[in-house]
């Protein structure tokens, strides 16, 4: 799981920013959504002591796992003071995340009743939670600790009543007689804590010791006079040792303090880190693709990656085909960086050896460029919407309709690609300028075609000659010496120009037969694919 580096804009009202912390599992992204009314209504009723208590237990557990010994009283007291003095914004952010988890675990039909009963607008009624796989009360982690979980009813009592319960105190909880489903009810007003005789007995002496400490040291209490140690033995009062660092009066005082006095959190937008799971679908997070070309190719790649990273969604432009004659997306194809990966490693740039296309051909460039990056499907009547088992590449959604700058690095063609091997063997310099050429089998039959963006769609190459046909070298004009093109095939004033005015545009391609060893000896001047 990765955290988003950017923060989405939100709304502010009543002088406080209302946000909830959201995480979408399918899209694997974090974002911030407007504060949910469930969290906004319950946040003022959460006790601030809950933040201190949960974090104190986590610190003690972490210290014990690291040092293999318990935290000393001085260290524990320092941690307690640090947590009590934490900023209200931090406490409210934590409470918002925890309330979001609780909302998820409460059945939808009981969420409104839960809010109304906690806020005092309705008499207490049962609020059922979603059971676990065994039909029992669910357990959640309150501080993103996978190894430390708390029962939902324990969390409710700590949050809304401020009772310092341990995670193992689930057996001490007692449901009210009015509760109709004690096994799954998480209504705080239906949950009580059982007090045993030992608790009552200890409460008296601990409270007496605490009250005696609050008095003036110069005036010792009567209990201190009676319980003076004799002959070095401990007094009766000293046999009760408190394991915590809270005194009785301090514990009662901090457990009654609300975490938020207002109707919403008051933390700033820049402090937000993450969110809970709410209400935004992955489709709502998608960025709409621009209709015109952008100046930054990085933004285009980022938007394409966002489209590819959301599984289980339909492509953006499914069923919205464009005719080759529509020139709304003709601009922008030449702005793609030449170093970007493409399925057949063919690079297209403005520095190509081809002449500039005529205005009549410009309308089909955007369509032809996008069609070039689609996977080639073999077969006489193959459909572009074939099953993934036919294509031999990952099943992530592929945008198949025309666009100005799509490049899918995840698509891989079959390693035994006849055209690729042929271009690398015969025409290494023209591998970047391959026109509309069919995939050739050993018997010369064509199985698929790669569209050339520099030619309109109606111009198709002639069928390949029979297997015994040999390539015919083209005549060269005697007036100009042959020179090789520079800058990746860029046209120069001294480059040779071949013209065949008597032939039609469809016959201006060199037709080649099956692979033959004699192809290696083809002269240099026959390596130009476009002859017009």
UniProtKB/Swiss-Prot annotation:
Residues 386-399, 521-532 have a biased composition (Polar residues). It comes from the Eukaryota. It is found in: Nucleus. Disulfide bonds: none annotated. Keywords: Activator, DNA replication, DNA-binding, Methylation, Nucleus, Phosphoprotein, Transcription, Transcription regulation. Its main location: nucleus. One of its GO terms (biological process) is limb morphogenesis. Residues 212-222, 282-298, 319-332, 352-364, 492-505 have a biased composition (Low complexity). The modification Phosphoserine is found at residues 281, 288, 303, 310, 323, 328, 342, 383, 492. Residues 24-217 bind DNA. Recognizes and binds the palindromic sequence 5'-TTGGCNNNNNGCCAA-3' present in viral and cellular promoters and in the origin of replication of adenovirus type 2. These proteins are individually capable of activating transcription and replication. This is Nuclear factor 1 A-type. It comes from Mus musculus. The lineage of its organism: Eukaryota, Metazoa, Chordata, Craniata, Vertebrata. The gene is Nfia.
């Amino acid at each position: 799981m990765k955290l988003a580096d950017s923060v989405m804009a939100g709304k502010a009202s009543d002088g406080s920013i209302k946000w909830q912390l959201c995480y979408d599992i399918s899209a694997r992204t974090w974002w911030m959504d407007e504060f949910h009314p469930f969290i906004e209504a319950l946040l003022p009723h959460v006790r601030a002591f809950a933040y201190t208590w949960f974090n104190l237990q986590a610190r003690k557990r972490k210290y014990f796992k690291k040092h293999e010994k318990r935290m000393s009283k001085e260290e524990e007291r320092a941690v307690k003071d640090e947590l009590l003095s934490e900023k209200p914004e931090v406490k409210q952010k934590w409470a918002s995340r925890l309330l979001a988890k609780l909302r998820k675990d409460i059945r939808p039909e009981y969420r409104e009743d839960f809010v109304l009963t906690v806020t005092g607008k309705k008499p207490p009624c049962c609020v059922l939670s979603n059971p676990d796989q065994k039909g029992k009360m669910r357990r959640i982690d309150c501080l993103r600790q996978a190894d430390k979980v708390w029962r939902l009813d324990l969390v409710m009592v700590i949050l809304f009543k401020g009772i310092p319960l341990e995670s193992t105190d689930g057996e001490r909880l007692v449901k009210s007689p009015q509760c109709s489903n004690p096994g799954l009810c998480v209504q705080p007003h239906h949950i009580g804590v059982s007090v045993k005789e030992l608790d009552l007995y200890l409460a008296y002496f601990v409270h007496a010791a605490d009250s005696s400490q609050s008095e003036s040291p110069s005036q010792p209490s009567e209990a201190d006079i009676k319980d003076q140690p004799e002959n070095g033995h401990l007094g009766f009062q000293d046999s009760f040792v408190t394991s915590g660092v809270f005194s009785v009066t301090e514990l009662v005082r901090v457990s009654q303090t609300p975490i938020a006095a207002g109707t919403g959190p008051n933390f700033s937008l820049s402090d937000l880190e993450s969110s809970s799971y709410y209400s935004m679908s992955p489709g709502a997070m998608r960025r709409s693709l621009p209709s015109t070309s952008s100046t930054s190719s990085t933004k285009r790649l980022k938007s394409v990656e966002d489209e590819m990273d959301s599984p289980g969604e339909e492509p953006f432009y499914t069923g919205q085909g464009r005719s080759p004659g529509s020139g709304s997306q003709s601009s922008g194809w030449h702005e793609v960086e030449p170093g970007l990966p493409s399925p057949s490693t063919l690079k297209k740039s403005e520095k190509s050896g081809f002449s500039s296309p005529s205005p009549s051909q410009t309308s089909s460039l955007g369509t032809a460029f996008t069609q070039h990056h689609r996977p080639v499907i073999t077969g006489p009547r193959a459909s572009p919407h074939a099953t993934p088992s036919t294509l031999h590449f990952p099943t992530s959604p592929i945008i198949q309709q025309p666009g100005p700058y799509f490049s899918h690095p995840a698509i891989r063609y079959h390693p035994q690609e006849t055209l690729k091997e042929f271009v690398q063997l015969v025409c290494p310099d023209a591998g970047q300028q391959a026109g509309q050429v069919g995939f050739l089998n050993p018997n010369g039959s064509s199985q698929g075609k790669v569209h050339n963006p520099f030619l309109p769609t109606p111009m198709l190459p002639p069928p390949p000659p029979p297997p015994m046909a040999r390539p015919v070298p083209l005549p060269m004009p005697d007036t100009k010496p042959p020179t090789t093109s520079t800058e990746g095939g860029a046209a120069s004033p001294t480059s040779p120009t071949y013209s065949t005015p008597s032939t039609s545009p469809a016959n201006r391609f060199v037709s080649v037969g099956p692979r033959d060893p004699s192809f290696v000896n083809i002269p240099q001047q026959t390596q130009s694919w476009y002859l017009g």
